[in-house]
């Protein structure tokens, strides 16, 4: 029996995933008190997956019209569109391989792999985010 089999503390990829999921929990707690509280009605397993999805959505929104847009406002050559593209591509890569250096993307990829969330569901979300880069009033 290996040492890993006798310890309850995760190691390796499991430890990294646990840290990523804690980061996602911080995102939801900081950005949406009501949504964070609502997730407490869910079971622990479901709650974490909802947090992982919420965190990815929240960060993508920050790239488009939140903190990133604010930070890049005075930066010459700033291109939020390319930031969204890179975020999206990293998301696909992480879903495929099960790892990202971006903790929020890593946590989302863990959920996507567990729940069978594929590109056909992810891509429309990122397309929607891109519309916020150009369209400020939505009629639909």
Residue ranges and their predicted role:
Residues 1-140:
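Acidic catalytic motifs of isoprenoid enzymes
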């Amino acid at each position: 029996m290996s040492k890993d089999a006798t310890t309850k503390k995760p190691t390796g990829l499991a430890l990294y995933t646990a840290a990523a999921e804690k980061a996602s929990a911080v995102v939801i707690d900081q950005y949406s008190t009501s949504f964070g509280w609502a997730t407490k009605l869910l079971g622990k397993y479901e709650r974490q997956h909802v947090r992982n999805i919420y965190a990815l959505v929240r960060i993508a929104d920050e790239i488009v019209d939140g903190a990133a847009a604010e930070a890049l406002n005075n930066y010459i050559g700033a291109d939020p569109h390319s930031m969204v593209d890179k975020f999206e591509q990293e998301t696909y890569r992480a879903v495929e391989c099960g790892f990202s250096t971006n903790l929020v993307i890593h946590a989302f990829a863990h959920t996507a792999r567990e729940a069978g969330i594929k590109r056909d569901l992810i891509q429309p979300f990122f397309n929607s985010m891109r519309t916020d880069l150009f369209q400020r009033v939505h009629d639909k």
